[in-house]
Structures are given as C-alpha cells and as structure tokens.
Regions:
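A conserved short beta-strand
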Residues: 13-19
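Surface-exposed acidic, glycine-flexible loop patches that form ligand/cofactor-binding
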Residues: 7-12
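Active-site-adjacent substrate-binding region
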Residues: 17, 24-135
Length: 135
C-alpha cells in the first residue's frame, strides 16, 4: 500500500475517500471507531457508523473508540492525503486486541458469518448510494 500511496493506479487519480475492510466477516464481529480513522477521516467514520445505526447494525458498528492500528489506511492518509478509514473487528477479550483466530491456523472459512457480511455490505451500499445522491 505504501507504493500505491505514492503512485496512483491512474495518473492524476484522486479518490474522495477510502474504506479498508479488515477482518469484517467473523461471527459476532465488533467494529469500534479505530484511532487513525478518527484522526484522519472522522466525517467518513461518522457517515459509515450513522448508516449502520439507521440500518439496525449498531451491534456491529459500535461507538467505542479503539487505539490506532497501523495498517494500509494509515499510509493512504499520511502519505497520499486521501481520508481513509479502517473497519476492523477488534476484541477487548484478547491480549492483541484482535480476534483469537487472527493470524492463526484456526482462521478458516468456517469463521465467516453471513449476517456479519450482510451488515457490512448493506451499510457500505447505503453509504455509496447516499454519496452518489449528493454528487
């Protein structure tokens, strides 16, 4: 992502904003408002979480704040300047803050949940739909 932060895929291309989906399909996923997302793109976080709430997905898109996570969105924000958020499943129950199966051999297709994917997908479709109505 560091390369793309400095070298857009199309010359002079500039996105309005970006959304990174990071481990967003697990059963009982919780997506707090991630620290760098709130620092660089609080209005995008607000749009996404507001849409999730209005669709009834507040149990996934929680209003808790998390510590900053250094991932692709950090570089897109800090190098490219495109406001970008990270929707990431975090757990207060583990030492790492990530789900127990994160980067483990137990991470497999059985952990993917249709309802979580539906919540994320419908939320983002609503965000995109609302964006296209404005522009």
């Amino acid at each position: 992502m560091l390369f793309r932060s400095k070298n857009p895929h199309v010359k002079n291309y500039r996105a309005y904003y970006g959304i990174l989906l990071d481990m967003t399909a697990a059963v009982n996923a919780r997506f707090p408002k991630e620290g760098f997302s709130m620092q660089y793109a609080p209005s995008i976080v607000g749009q996404v979480w507001s849409n999730a709430q209005s669709l009834g997905y507040g149990n996934y898109f929680v209003s808790d704040l998390s510590n900053p996570i250094t991932d692709d969105h950090y570089y897109v924000n800090s190098i490219n300047g495109t406001p970008t958020i990270d929707i990431i499943n975090l757990s207060a129950e583990t030492k790492t803050g990530f789900a127990p199966h994160w980067h483990a051999q137990t991470d497999n297709m059985n952990l993917i949940d249709r309802e979580t994917m539906k919540a994320v997908g419908q939320t983002l479709l609503q965000v995109i739909y609302n964006e296209s109505a404005v522009n």
